[in-house]
């Protein structure tokens, strides 16, 4: 059995930094017990200039879960329920931030979003 991973484009709210775009990339499927690695590429704004940069996911049935964020300073905060399995890092030279979720199971089947 595989864990289904869906990626979607998530953009800023209209009228507020409307040229900022966030684009997720990574695998569509990950096998149970493997690690999920996703990339969020930000255009139109430097991730070191401000804000916190988040990962969230939406489960089948539309339940949302906040996973964690990396602050523009580089500090991170994680959902306590995921803390033992999650890491969020960044590459400031590429204006990207990353999600790694270890030891995935079928319960991690969701659509994954990055957001500001």
Curated annotation (Swiss-Prot):
Residue segments, region Complementarity-determining-1: 49-53
A Gene Ontology term for the protein's cellular component: extracellular region
Gene Ontology MF term list: antigen binding
Disulfide bonds: 40-114
UniProt xrefs under PROSITE patterns: IG_LIKE (PS50835)
Renumbered residue ranges of the record's region Framework-3: 85-116
Domain of life of the native organism: Eukaryota
Residues making up the signal peptide according to the UniProt record: 1-18
One GO term of the biological process aspect: immunoglobulin mediated immune response
Keywords: Adaptive immunity, Disulfide bond, Immunity, Immunoglobulin, Signal
rRNA-binding found in the keyword field: no
Ranges for region Framework-1: 19-48
Renumbered residue ranges of the record's region Complementarity-determining-2: 68-84
Region ranges (Framework-2): 54-67
Other facts noted in the record for this chain: This sequence belongs to the VH3660 subfamily.
Name of the protein in question: Ig heavy chain V region 1B43
């Amino acid at each position: 059995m595989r864990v289904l991973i869906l990626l979607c484009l998530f953009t800023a709210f209209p009228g507020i930094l409307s040229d900022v775009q966030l684009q997720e990339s990574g695998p569509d499927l990950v096998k149970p017990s493997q690690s999920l690695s996703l990339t969020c590429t930000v255009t139109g704004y430097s991730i070191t200039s401000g804000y916190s940069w988040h990962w969230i996911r939406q489960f089948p049935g539309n339940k949302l879960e906040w996973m964690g964020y990396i602050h523009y300073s580089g500090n991170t905060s994680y959902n306590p329920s995921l803390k033992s399995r999650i890491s969020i890092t960044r590459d400031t030279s590429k204006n990207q931030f990353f999600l790694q979720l270890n030891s995935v199971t079928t319960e991690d089947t969701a659509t994954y979003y990055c957001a500001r």
